[in-house]
Amino acid sequence: MGSDGSSLSPKVSQPGHTEIVDHVSEKVITNGKNVNKKVNAEVDGKSMVEKVKTHEENAEDYHYGGYHPVYIGEEFHHRRYVVERKLGWGHFSTVWLAYDRAAKRRVALKVVRSAEHYRETSIDEIRILQKIREGDEKHLGKKHIISLLDYFVHRGPNGAHVCMVFEVLGENLLSLIQSYGHRGVPVGIVKQIAYQLLIALDYLHRECGIIHTDLKPENVLICIDQDALQHIEAPATTSSPTSNTSSSKTRNNTGYTAKAPIIKRGQSVDNSAQERKTFAKNPTKNSKPAGQVIPSSPFTSTLSRFPSLEGAVSEISLRDSQKHNSHPNSPFSSGDNSLILDGVNGSQEPVPKITVKIADLGNACWTRKHFTNDVQTRQYRSPEVILGCRWGASADCWSFACIIFELLTGDYLFDPRNGNSYSKEDDHIAQIIELLVNYPKQMALSGKHSRDLFNRRGELRNIHKLKFWPLKDVLEQKYHFSAELAQQISDFLSPMLCFDPAKRTNAGYMSNSPWLREVADPTFKIETTGATGEDVPGWATEIR
């Protein structure tokens, strides 16, 4: 099996027995253990924002080629996995909390819609997850990417569904941001998150040749151990079907719920008329009647269950910004599971440890094979993608910088809006230029969409009055960070907010930043040949 994105196809054998076959090598790929998890981004994206009204999948999508009618107590894969409750859903799949009888633990089970293009997309995702699994164990970044534990094909009345089994993680970073009232997460906690994400990105980019393409707070999950999961009670409503509810889109929706997945090209899956007849005559036992939908029952705040994330922060990890980051209702405490970091006025203070993992690789691609140019969620979208220029792994570092700013301040770094005489794209590029002040006009004019945004002189076509506001000044004037801390943050983020993707600093190099020294693993250091992506193939453009 190569790492170039050539597709796998699920081969359905006898009922109840399936295997995924690599048609390139004709080898059976055994059910994987330990890869990644696209599921929880969908799961936790909803769980973290329970305050916002949740909606369910459309009952009309339960048909041949659509969702599998999962029911509580249903058994999957030779009775190994038993469904306990519904965690979430997306246009791509539904996600369920299940008990793994073999491993004696709870897992997240994602059941993909059975239509051919959804199956093909899931096979692409599995290939990417396998590449991540097979990478160098010595690279610590691997531990900060979610793990796929198993995969198989499940046959039901609506067709053959690719299923993926993931480790269950806690809530995502959006939940963390909200728990601090959008006023900023303590700096000591942000530093830990930043370091872990950077080494994870270096592992993806340098070791695996993979670009995430959709980094955002919703797709970074906080780890939670199995002991906490053992005490999660099943809600009383999980077995009660309900009709489809509101379909309004809100910020809490993540990769799956915010938009349909990007459809990738791959080898077609056999979807014969005979298979359709077989399922019509022999539907799965106890399957739900058409038109009924089990309501999602995501976890209540897992932050409160995570041992190192309980209690209040009081005055830890505030680093010169006590007023900015003082939150009496914070979910963190300074227990035994903590770090001692430099605090205010040179003092040393305990900061709770936090471990995060990158999730949702459903839109990921290879550095040598981009599936689409429609990548990145709006607020985390890089200028090269907006302009329609060539892009590469460095686009992830732009998104990373936007996430760190949001963690520190509680606000988006860029939040473009439509105007009477300009588009969101106009406003987005204008906001970027206002922050960076300078930009390469040659690049600005080189994209597929450049003529819509710039005139021949490289000036914005539809927005003429700009208010330049460099990052350090934004942090100091708007968010009241001290001048020293604002400078430190600006020095850390600015190299990854370079307009030109080829000159953007790579993740491995930034993991060695002095700003992260106190949270970095002293036994692990990423050696790079330069600050930018000289030694990262596909850094700024697709490898051809």
Swiss-Prot record:
This is Protein kinase dsk1. It holds the Pfam family Pkinase. The gene is dsk1. Residues 281-299, 327-337 have a biased composition (Polar residues). One of its GO terms (cellular component) is cell division site. Coiled coil: none annotated. Phosphorylated on Ser residue(s). Residues 81-516 form the Protein kinase domain. InterPro entries: Kinase-like_dom_sf, Prot_kinase_dom, Protein_kinase_ATP_BS, Ser/Thr_kinase_AS, SRPK.
